[in-house]
């Protein structure tokens, strides 16, 4: 039975994707398992997230994934939880020989809108939020150098995170797309009628495509000034992510424990 997971940053449409998969796969897709007893078992806790991003895919992280996978039913299963790809999802699918039954959805979003969403929601206002949900520039294992971003003040960390996740998505595509089935899509494509239809076709799902209404929209709208500020900074950032990642892989970078 097929299992569906995401490689995505968060604030990228994962809640909407949950509704899409629920409607079109005919199952109760999971967004984020947030019960008290889920953390450390079905949902990575802060220790798991920090361990992977400081030490790599060590034994502690691998034990979490053994628990996680053992609780997944032997049926069609979909989980759009964006924390999973930041603590060893892809590596541990391979370690547990689950690659043949897995489809990974590489979900991206316009980087300006993505960054603005983090800022408006204060997602990086407390270090524990970065530890549990996102990434922190102080982590040892990372692809993008955070130092230039830190010069930007309060917007530096969320902007660095956008580029770090873009690089990680590219890393997993370049390194593992010949081992695990991956579908790459943007939120902007996915939420259009034609894009949703095409994605539905890629998933080889029977029946008509059902397009759900928007989810998890922020009622606090960003100012035009903030959007313009982030747009101008992004325009000045000249980085070839595919080439950077190719060079990084060639230099021996890996998220496996060393």
Question: Where would I find each of the regions flagged by the language model?
Answer:
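PAPS-dependent sulfotransferase catalytic core
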Residues: 1-71, 128-151, 155, 206-258
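Structural motif
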Residues: 3-5, 76, 103-105
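Short, flexible loop/turn elements at secondary-structure junctions
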Residues: 8-11, 81-82, 111, 189-191
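Acidic-histidine catalytic/liganding microenvironments
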Residues: 24-25, 81-82, 179
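Short, flexible loop segments at the rims of nucleotide/cofactor-binding pockets, characterized by
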Residues: 51-57, 80-83, 160-161
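Glycine-rich phosphate-binding loop used to anchor ATP phosphates in small-molecule kinases
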Residues: 68-92
């Amino acid at each position: 039975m097929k299992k569906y997971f995401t490689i995505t940053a968060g604030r990228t449409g994962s809640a909407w994707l949950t509704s899409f998969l629920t409607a079109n796969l005919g199952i109760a897709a999971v967004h984020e398992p947030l019960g008290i007893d889920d953390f450390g078992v079905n949902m990575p806790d802060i220790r798991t997230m920090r361990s992977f991003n400081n030490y790599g895919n060590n034994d502690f992280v691998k034990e979490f994934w053994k628990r996680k996978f053992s609780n997944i039913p032997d049926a069609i299963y979909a989980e759009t939880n964006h924390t999973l790809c930041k603590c060893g999802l892809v590596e541990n699918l391979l370690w547990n020989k689950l690659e043949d039954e897995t489809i990974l959805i590489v979900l991206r979003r316009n980087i300006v809108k993505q960054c603005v969403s983090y800022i408006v929601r204060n997602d990086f206002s407390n270090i524990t939020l970065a530890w549990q949900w996102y990434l922190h520039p102080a982590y040892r294992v990372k692809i993008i150098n955070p130092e230039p971003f830190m010069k930007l003040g309060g917007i530096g960390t969320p902007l660095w995170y956008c580029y770090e996740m873009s690089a990680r998505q590219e890393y997993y595509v370049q390194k593992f797309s010949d081992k695990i089935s991956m579908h790459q899509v943007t939120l902007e494509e996915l939420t259009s009628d034609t894009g949703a239809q095409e994605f539905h076709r890629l998933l080889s799902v029977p029946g008509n495509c059902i397009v759900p209404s928007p989810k998890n929209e922020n009622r606090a709208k960003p100012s035009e000034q903030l959007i313009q500020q982030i747009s101008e900074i992004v325009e000045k950032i000249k980085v070839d992510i595919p080439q950077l990642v190719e060079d990084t892989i060639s230099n021996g970078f890996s998220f496996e424990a060393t």
